[in-house]
C-alpha cells in the first residue's frame, strides 16, 4: 500500500520556498557557527526568523490562536523533512526542541497567564 503525501499547490509552494531558503540561507551558517558563537548566531538568525514569520511558517506545530500555523501532522512532517537537513533550521522556523514540545504542553495545560507569557 502506497501512502500519498502530496499536498495542495499553495502548500507545495511553501515547501519549495523552505527547501531553497534552508539551502541558501541556513546551511551557510553551519560553516561559521563556531566563529559567531551563541550570541552572534542568535543575531544572525533573527532576520531569517522574520522572513519565516512573514511567509506564515513560524511555529507551524502550534494552533493559530497561540501564534502558530496549525498545519497538521502530515504537513508538519513534510516541513520537518526539509528542516531536518540542518541542525539550525528548526530554530529559524520556531519549532526547535525542547521549545516545540514545551510549547505544546503549555498550549494544552498551561494557565492563561503562562500562555500569554511564553507562547
Across the structure, where does each feature detected by a protein language model lie?
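Intrinsic disorder at enzyme termini
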Residues: 1-15
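Solvent-exposed alpha-helix faces
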Residues: 16-19, 84
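Short, compositionally biased low-complexity segments
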Residues: 1, 20-23, 93
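Short hydrophobic motif
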Residues: 11, 18, 22-23, 52
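Glycine-rich flavin
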Residues: 28-119
